[in-house]
Curated annotation (Swiss-Prot):
Family statement drawn from the similarity comment of this UniProt entry: Belongs to the class-II pyridoxal-phosphate-dependent aminotransferase family. BioF subfamily.
Keyword tags: Acyltransferase, Biotin biosynthesis, Pyridoxal phosphate, Transferase
Protein's GO biological process: biotin biosynthetic process
E.C. number: 2.3.1.47
Quaternary assembly: Homodimer.
Enzyme class (EC, first level): transferase
Function: Catalyzes the decarboxylative condensation of pimeloyl-[acyl-carrier protein] and L-alanine to produce 8-amino-7-oxononanoate (AON), [acyl-carrier protein], and carbon dioxide.
Native species: Coprothermobacter proteolyticus (strain ATCC 35245 / DSM 5265 / OCM 4 / BT)
Presence of the UniProt keyword Membrane in the record: no
One family name in Pfam for this protein: Aminotran_1_2
Listed name of the protein: 8-amino-7-oxononanoate synthase
Annotated substrate binding sites: 132, 353
Positions bound to pyridoxal 5'-phosphate: 107-108, 180, 205-208, 236-239
Named cofactor requirement(s): pyridoxal 5'-phosphate
Length: 393
């Protein structure tokens, strides 16, 4: 493709309000950060519990480097496991109430590796239409038949299962647990009933449930009390855990199979000891206390209450993920720009991350935010919302 084609496509994205600008971060993650040289209130991070700059995690990461060096330097199946990797897998399995867990380099890799290891040609995947990009890509790589059902629509899903299930050897029902752009929650109890009834693998990506839902942030399976009924629970270490990495939790046989077949595990180096040690410390903190999880929910509920009073449409959010619905892509980009001028860092989310005409500001609340921070955020959102005609003056 000629360079002129690259330029044409980039110009089209700018004209349509779809061009993404990556800001420069000059500080650790926290309630306030330095962005492009400016101190701003951070409403863009997945750092739900403040672990990304937690002193205990930083000390643990340093110890990991001291004990095992900067990196593993090889694939686990070739050069072997460093002992902390196995220890973290055991801790994650216990935390999730599963028999075993398998560690990946990221949550994205976890889906890319796990889905094709479980289903393939001649099988079917029943997938929520708003599932994360990593699920979509993992499904495509599997070469299984992908059958999409309307978002959260269990009735239509069952109709599709009645029509299609008998045509395939294996079938999987796959869903996000918490949907990252809307903050709503999958009806896992009903999906578990359908998986039992139609003999399907039940697979959930709990990236935004860990550290948020369930007892001490154990996630969506714990939240619904479905231990033993969900076959695969995908997790990430890059959101509430504040580090980087991913994992799949489930039965011992699942873990054994993934270590034989999951390509990101077989063909890419393992996570670093620094990441592993920090992740273990995050699990320990959550096992010790649910104080940070409670603070997260207090902050989220306070912010939503005052944003709704100001007249904003927050969609159907059931979690700290707070979409501020705007619709028009260009207006949404302008909204983000004006907030930044007012020292608030909240990113515009538009196509292809969400459907065209569904652009929104996505606000991520953290346990590290103070009440003053939240009041400041509502004040600035209200001022910009009135200026741009998103809410009434």
């Amino acid at each position: 493709m000629p360079v002129e084609e690259f330029e044409r496509e980039l110009n089209e994205r700018r004209e349509q309000g779809l061009y993404v600008t990556i800001r420069k971060i000059g500080s650790p993650q926290g309630a306030w950060i330095i962005v492009d040289g400016k101190k701003v209130l951070n409403l863009s991070s997945n750092n739900y519990l403040g672990f990304a700059n937690h002193p205990r995690l930083k000390e643990a990461a340093k110890k990991g480097i001291d004990d095992y060096g900067a990196g593993p330097a090889a694939v686990r199946t070739i050069a072997g496991d460093q002992l902390p990797q196995e220890k973290l897998e055991e801790m994650l399995a216990e935390f999730k109430g599963a028999e075993a867990a398998v560690l990946y380099q990221s949550g994205f890799c976890a889906n890319l590796g796990t889905i094709p290891a479980l289903v393939g040609e001649g099988d079917a995947i029943f997938s929520d239409e708003l599932n994360h990009a990593s699920i979509i890509d993992g499904c495509r790589l599997s070469r299984a038949k992908i059958i999409r059902y309307p978002h959260l629509n269990v009735q239509t899903l069952e109709e599709l299962l009645k029509q299609e299930r008998q045509n395939y050897k294996k079938a999987m029902i796959i869903t996000d647990g918490v949907f990252s752009m809307d903050g709503d929650i999958a009806p896992m109890d009903k999906l578990a009933d359908l998986a039992d009834k139609y003999q399907c693998i039940l697979y959930v990506d709990d990236a935004h449930g860990e550290g948020v839902l369930g007892d001490s942030g154990r996630g969506i399976v714990d939240y619904f009390g479905l231990q033993g009924r969900v076959d695969v629970e995908i997790g990430t270490l890059s959101k509430a855990f504040g580090v980087v990495g991913g994992f799949a939790a489930g039965s011992k046989l699942l873990a054994e199979l993934l270590k034989q077949k999951a390509r990101p595990l077989l063909f890419s180096s393992a996570p670093t000891a620094a990441d592993v040690y920090a992740s273990m410390e995050a699990v320990r903190i959550l096992q010790e206390s649910d104080e940070l999880v409670k603070k997260l929910w207090e902050n989220a509920n306070y912010f939503k209450e005052h944003m709704r009073k100001a007249g904003f449409d927050l969609g159907n959010s059931q979690t700290p993920i707070t979409p501020v619905m705007i619709g028009d892509e260009i207006t949404t980009q302008e909204f983000s720009k004006k907030l930044f001028e007012r020292n608030v860092f909240a990113q515009a989310i538009s196509y292809p991350t969400v459907p065209k005409g569904k652009a929104r500001m996505r606000v991520m609340i953290s346990a590290t935010h103070s009440r003053d921070d939240l009041d400041f955020a509502v004040e600035q959102f209200t001022a910009v919302g009135k200026e741009l005609g998103v809410i009434q003056s």
